[in-house]
């Protein structure tokens, strides 16, 4: 996970140094790990090591503090020559001894269309179907993307996926690309953001390279275009994309588009484009609910080979409810906090790591959350509580669950009754019964209060890093 910590450090550093400083000093550094709260960095030689200590140590410490490190430490290690060559692959290659000068007025040639072997060059290797967590918020979009990957140009063309930022639209698009590239290595795949498409078109017009530009985008088998809403108001780009769309569609080539809104809500989008975007399937992705957020965090931890207690993942999932990008960022912050402060993963550590970035909030409580916590406390199962059993060891947990759902959610009595397979009068009786019993039975009152705090994530935590 030191790679991820170093990536966040670099993001901080980049805002505080010049491009030349960044490229010269920071880009070649390689993170070697976190040992007893100290970030270990590999550098090329002793001169670089001394230079960092004299000129950039305070900047690095400030970057680590921004990640939650209370007593940040950085150690530098000179890499052996062989390891240096292995770990520093991004250094620029030496210039040819007799390279011919390039005239300044000559534009670089437009890259040719993808050829077999390089059809994933525009795809993010991290975005695949295997690591896409499916939940009620995205199951239709996932199913549609998988169908398109199985039968490109036939199932749904175009596939239009919309939703707020950070919910997985781009992930699904890249997943289709990887799936297709795996099955058909000869297929030509192109992923592009609308902004990049527009900028490349402008450059092509300026350099009289429109033919090459059109050949590039109209000769692909799969075109993935992100943030298509940014076509709005760009008449020349809309004109070009209209003809690109037609060329691909008429050749039965697959088109996948993403947006933050459905086609009908994209203002100043030409009607002919809007109608074409609606030819295939339009599907949306919503914010993930609690269980899906926990599953996403669990997958991220497993991929990073990090063992994090379930209760910590649950706390993060309750704290961050907006989108997946922020959810993953919160997990990274918790990991960095624990690693850099040399403390174990715990609810207290997670709460402290997130306290300065994600303000505590009353996360929305779901009926399934309540049911799961009550079942765990009473040593039974959600299915038994929702079942028809009349034994006391089932009836009491059932009534407690109904009471807490009524108290902690906005669900109506009929909705709660439907969830339990009963009518609203049964729920009303359960709420009244538990309310009455809590006034007479301190032990029951304490149990209900404990469950309430646990469900809301308000249990007392031990101090961390005090």
UniProtKB/Swiss-Prot annotation:
Residues 87-122 are annotated as: Disordered. Residues 77-121 are annotated as: Domain II. It comes from the Bacteria. InterPro entries: AAA+_ATPase, Chromosome_initiator_DnaA, Chromosome_initiator_DnaA-like, Chromosome_initiator_DnaA_CS, DnaA_C, DnaA_dom, DnaA_N_dom, DnaA_N_sf. Keywords: ATP-binding, Cytoplasm, DNA replication, DNA-binding, Lipid-binding, Nucleotide-binding. Changing residue 276 to A: No strand separation in vitro, wild-type ATP binding. Plays an essential role in the initiation and regulation of chromosomal replication. ATP-DnaA binds to the origin of replication (oriC) to initiate formation of the DNA replication initiation complex once per cell cycle. Binds the DnaA box (a 9 base pair repeat at the origin) and separates the double-stranded (ds)DNA. Forms a right-handed helical filament on oriC DNA; dsDNA binds to the exterior of the filament while single-stranded (ss)DNA is stabiized in the filament's interior. GO terms for biological process: DNA replication; DNA replication initiation; regulation of DNA replication. Residues 339-466 are annotated as: Domain IV, binds dsDNA. The keyword Amino-acid biosynthesis does not apply. The gene is dnaA. The keyword ATP-binding applies. It comes from Deinococcus radiodurans (strain ATCC 13939 / DSM 20539 / JCM 16871 / CCUG 27074 / LMG 4051 / NBRC 15346 / NCIMB 9279 / VKM B-1422 / R1). Residues 97-108 have a biased composition (Low complexity). GO terms for molecular function: ATP binding; ATP hydrolysis activity; DNA replication origin binding; lipid binding. Belongs to the DnaA family. It is found in: Cytoplasm. Oligomerizes as a right-handed, spiral filament on DNA at oriC. Residues 1-77 are annotated as: Domain I, interacts with DnaA modulators. ATP binds at residues 166, 168-170. The lineage of its organism: Bacteria, Thermotogati, Deinococcota, Deinococci, Deinococcales. GO terms for cellular component: cytoplasm; plasma membrane. This is Chromosomal replication initiator protein DnaA. Domain I is involved in oligomerization and binding regulators, domain II is flexibile and of varying length in different bacteria, domain III forms the AAA+ region, while domain IV binds dsDNA. Residues 122-338 are annotated as: Domain III, AAA+ region.
